[in-house]
């Protein structure tokens, strides 16, 4: 039983490390801040949570203890990492950072123009 648990733990930790490695290549190779932030937030959300799940399963199966701290860490990263990536992209967009020329769609532009128009109308 313990050997099987160690294999499961190793798979989770190695898979998490592989996801983080792939995300780091994405951060280095992708063209603009928006796609880089996307790769970084996905890598941290999935990769780090897989590693923490591996640690949680190790503590549970091998040592027999359940760690609420690790579960809270998983929950914290699962919630805050996508929000942080979104806020970084939103701040970059609002400060005038341009999309890469290969980007085919700018979803935020229509909403931004609508909000600006609505603010102008409310001042009249």
Swiss-Prot record:
Q: Which UniProt keywords apply?
A: Antiport, Cell membrane, Hydrogen ion transport, Ion transport, Membrane, Sodium, Sodium transport, Transmembrane, Transmembrane helix, Transport
Other information:
Mrp-dependent antiport apparently occurs by a secondary, proton motive force-dependent mechanism, but the similarity of several Mrp proteins to membrane-embedded subunits of energy-coupled NADH dehydrogenase complexes raises the possibility that there is a capacity for electron transport that could provide a primary energy coupling option for Mrp functions.
Gene Ontology molecular-function annotations:
sodium:proton antiporter activity
List the membrane topology term(s). Multi-pass membrane protein
This protein's gene is called mrpG
Keyword Ion transport on entry: yes
A Pfam family of this chain: PhaG_MnhG_YufB
InterPro entries xrefs: PhaG_MnhG_YufB
Q: What is the lineage of its organism?
A: Bacteria, Bacillati, Bacillota, Bacilli, Bacillales
Q: State where the protein is found.
A: Cell membrane
Q: Which family does it belong to?
A: Belongs to the CPA3 antiporters (TC 2.A.63) subunit G family.
Q: What is this protein called?
A: Na(+)/H(+) antiporter subunit G
Protein function: May enhance MrpA stability, assembly, or function. May play chaperone or assembly roles for MrpA and perhaps for other mrp proteins.
* Signal peptide (residue range): none
Cellular component GO terms, alphabetical: plasma membrane
Species assigned in the record: Bacillus subtilis (strain 168)
């Amino acid at each position: 039983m313990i050997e099987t648990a160690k294999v499961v733990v190793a798979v989770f930790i190695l898979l998490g490390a592989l996801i983080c490695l792939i995300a780091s290549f994405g951060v280095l190779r992708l063209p603009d801040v928006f796609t880089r932030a996307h790769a970084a937030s996905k890598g941290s959300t999935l990769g780090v949570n897989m590693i923490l799940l591996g640690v949680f399963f190790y503590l549970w199966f091998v040592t027999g203890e359940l760690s609420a701290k690790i579960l809270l860490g998983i929950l914290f990263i699962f919630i805050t990492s996508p929000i942080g990536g979104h806020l970084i992209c939103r701040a970059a967009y609002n400060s005038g950072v341009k999309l890469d020329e290969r980007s085919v769609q700018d979803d935020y532009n229509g909403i931004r123009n609508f909000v600006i128009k609505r603010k102008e109308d409310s001042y009249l």
